Each structure stands twice: as structure tokens, then as C-alpha cells.
Amino acid sequence: MNYNDPLEPAMIITKVLSKSDIVGNVVLPKAEVMSVLTRMNVNDQDLLNGVEVQVDDIMEDDLYTVTLKVSGIDKPKYYFGTGWSTMKHSLDLSEGDVLKLYWSHLDNKFVVLNFQYSVLPLMIPV
């Protein structure tokens, strides 16, 4: 991913975390996930079984593997299952925090966009 290129808004998932997201699995906003799915090359059956995806925290240089799943057919709910617990604790997320993820289709992974506490270092050639 070239971090100098503008981000595609349709590839961003934003979620204000609820108590149930912190205690259990995080349910992701349906419309935003469906937009990202257009670039993920997965089908409904894949999601019912669960698809392992990587989530890259470029600020801390951490890479997480989480399972993206869907439950229900008539009213689908998209969520992170396995791996979410490790990720939320490592990112020190709590109720009311905003989780912001960008799907980098070129790298085939999510990138954490929670930069509010850090500043990206400038790369100055020497």
C-alpha cells in the first residue's frame, strides 16, 4: 500500500464500539462491509464458514489475523470472530472508542486508521 495515495472512502469501515463489541465479537456496519466485500473476492459461503483476514496496525508494527464471518441469511450480521479478542486488547480498545479500518485491496488486508494518538513520521531522504 502506498500511504501517500488518497484512501478510497468506500473501502473504510468505521465502528463506534459498544459494550457487546468489547465483551464479545465486534459486529461491523453492514453497508460498509458490503462495500468492502466487492473488492475482497469472497462469496457468501466463504463468509458463513469464516474468512481469515489480516489487520495491519502500521503505527505499532503489529499484524493480526481475525476471522470475518456472517451470521443469518435474511438479516446478515458481519462480525470479527476469532482473533478479535487479541486485537482489541492489543489496541487497548474500550466502549465508545472508534475503530476505523481501511481495506487495502492491493495488499489484501485491513489497515488500522486509528491515528489519533500518534503522528506518522515523515520520511526525509538523507
From Swiss-Prot:
GO-annotated molecular function: DNA binding
One Gene Ontology term, aspect cellular component: nucleus
UniProt key word Protease: no
Subcellular localization, as worded in the UniProt entry: Nucleus
Alphabetized InterPro entries for the sequence: B3_DNA-bd, B3_domain, DNA-bd_pseudobarrel_sf
DNA-binding region: 20-118
Keywords: DNA-binding, Nucleus, Transcription, Transcription regulation
Protein name (record): B3 domain-containing protein At5g54067
Organism whose genome encodes this protein: Arabidopsis thaliana (Mouse-ear cress)
